[in-house]
């Protein structure tokens, strides 16, 4: 299941205002409905720290209570420019899913480089 979270906050405000709710929404959905769910976080301003924080969620546990938690979650940041490209190119969900899962599996550690190579360039090259 794909969850979509959007914000109009900018810069580190997006990090402070969205990091916890986006993670909580996805984690709760995973625990309650579908452990294979993932999320795209759409913003008109993706600060490197926001990209980094969501990228790190892949490998860090999250706990709803002392007895309920998950080992990690897939939250993929997406700039509105790339969303526009997805819509203009009429990129199908199956293509997007494949692209997103490939991005999750990437070994690139530097957040802006990871985003540019695994999300932005891949969407532009579909």
Task: List PLM regions with ranges.
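Catalytic core segments in nucleotide and nucleic-acid processing enzymes
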Residues: 1-123
């Amino acid at each position: 299941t794909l969850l979509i979270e959007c914000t109009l906050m900018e810069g580190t405000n997006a990090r402070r205002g969205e990091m916890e709710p986006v993670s909580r929404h996805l984690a709760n959905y995973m625990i309650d409905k579908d452990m294979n769910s993932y999320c795209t976080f759409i913003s008109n301003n993706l600060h490197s720290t926001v990209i980094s924080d969501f990228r790190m969620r892949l490998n860090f546990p999250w706990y709803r209570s002392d007895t309920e938690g998950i080992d990690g979650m897939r939250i993929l940041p997406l700039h509105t420019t790339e969303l526009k490209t997805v819509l203009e190119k009429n990129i199908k969900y199956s293509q997007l899913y494949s692209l997103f899962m490939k991005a999750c599996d990437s070994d690139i550690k530097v957040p802006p480089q990871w985003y540019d190579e695994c999300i932005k360039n891949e969407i532009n090259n579909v």
